[in-house]
UniProtKB/Swiss-Prot annotation:
Cross-link position per record: Glycyl lysine isopeptide (Lys-Gly) (interchain with G-Cter in ubiquitin): K146
Record has Aminoacyl-tRNA synthetase as a keyword: no
GO cellular component labels: nucleosome; nucleus
Subcellular location: Nucleus; Chromosome
Predominant location category: nucleus
Residue span of region Disordered: 1-57
Family: Belongs to the histone H2B family.
Any Pfam family matching the protein: Histone
Superkingdom assignment: Eukaryota
UniProt PTM comment: Can be acetylated to form H2BK6ac and H2BK33ac. Monoubiquitinated to form H2BK143ub1; may give a specific tag for epigenetic transcriptional activation.
Gene Ontology molecular functions: DNA binding; protein heterodimerization activity; structural constituent of chromatin
Protein name: Histone H2B.2
Length: 150
């Protein structure tokens, strides 16, 4: 957060260049130093603004697109509200967190450093109940087979 604090004064001080110009010796050296970071920070602000936006978009990963695609496959004529979409997104994040935690436990129990499809499959069987687990395992196996064959 300190770099942001440095950028804000650098952005404010070029606007105050006229009063700084009156202070010739003291103002010139800091001006030169301020101009270089201001130029750099202006370049970085533009770059970071773009990068920051990209990072912002990357950090906000949602499953909304995929939920919508599945909804349209199952019920093409039905829509979904933004609140319902948010609930579905939270539900998927929660399930994936539970599956990842269970897979990590299984890998630790077996003293293996890698989570493989086997750990994921076992964690699905442990986390999801009965028939839902069977369907999830069959769909997952089908997806992995399709992925490896192509």
């Amino acid at each position: 957060m300190a770099p942001k604090a440095e950028k804000k004064p650098a952005a404010k001080k070029p606007a105050e260049e006229e009063p700084a110009a009156e202070k010739a010796p003291a103002g010139k050296k800091p001006k030169a130093e301020k101009r270089v970071p201001a130029g750099k920070s202006a370049g970085k602000e533009g770059g970071e603004g773009k990068r920051g936006r990209k990072k912002g978009k990357k950090s906000v990963e949602t499953y909304k697109i995929y939920i919508f695609k599945v909804l349209k496959q199952v019920h093409p004529d039905i829509g979904i509200s933004s609140k319902a979409m948010s609930i579905m997104n939270s539900f998927i994040n929660d399930i994936f967190e539970k599956l990842a935690a269970e897979a990590a436990k299984l890998a630790r129990y077996n003293k293996k450093p890698t989570i493989t499809s086997r750990e994921i499959q076992t964690s699905v069987r442990l986390v999801l109940p009965g028939e839902l687990a069977k369907h999830a395992v069959s769909e997952g196996t089908k997806a992995v087979t399709k992925f490896t064959s192509s």
